[in-house]
Amino acid sequence: MSRYRGPRLRIVRRLGDLPGLTRKSARRAYPPGQHGQNRKKRSEYAIRLEEKQKLRLNYGLTEKQLLRYVRRARRVTGSTGQVLLQLLEMRLDNTVFRLGMAPTIPAARQLVNHGHVTVNGRVVNIASYQCRPGEEIAVRDKAPSRKLVENNLQYPGLANLPSHLEFDKNKLVGKVNSVIEREWVALQVNELLVVEYYSRQA
């Protein structure tokens, strides 16, 4: 399954706010479609599926990519759900988004893919790159790159910088100080239900 490229507000109305996908909020509180307001009681499977979809769409992943992350999380000591969120949050595209360099994760991915971002002084154009504590994330020292990010900083996707990051707006340089803590994950999701969803596949 490929990444979702359809109407974003339609997804937000169905799943709730997805801060990584879009800054817009749904004006209608019920799901889209003719029968959106007449929702039947959902099965446990449907609830787990919805949480999985939230995670996949917010971080802009394909089904295969998310499954790989679940498998990686299972191999790490600790809560699989929490490790899964940390792996997703520490991706380079998400880190660029959380630093305020881009208004959404898709926009951050584009910055990375087009070579506008450096890690420890070297251009990294792989959005899935895992950022580590101590690494410096910066805007490439080129006029087009700086202009893009300076424009984005005027309209950040999220207001608060998470505690594991720091950012110098004048130099356009950020630093990863630690791995993100659960309370700073912006997406409202039950990660345990996501792990349960994949329990037979991972």
Curated annotation (Swiss-Prot):
Signal peptide: none annotated. Pfam families: Ribosomal_S4, S4. Disulfide bonds: none annotated. One of its GO terms (cellular component) is small ribosomal subunit. It comes from the Bacteria. InterPro entries: Ribosomal_uS4 (IPR022801), Ribosomal_uS4_bac-type (IPR005709), Ribosomal_uS4_CS (IPR018079), Ribosomal_uS4_N (IPR001912), S4_RNA-bd (IPR002942), S4_RNA-bd_sf (IPR036986). GO terms for biological process: ribosomal small subunit biogenesis; translation. GO terms for molecular function: rRNA binding; structural constituent of ribosome. Residues 22-43 are annotated as: Disordered. CDD domains: S4. Belongs to the universal ribosomal protein uS4 family. Part of the 30S ribosomal subunit. Contacts protein S5. The interaction surface between S4 and S5 is involved in control of translational fidelity. One of the primary rRNA binding proteins, it binds directly to 16S rRNA where it nucleates assembly of the body of the 30S subunit. With S5 and S12 plays an important role in translational accuracy. This is Small ribosomal subunit protein uS4.
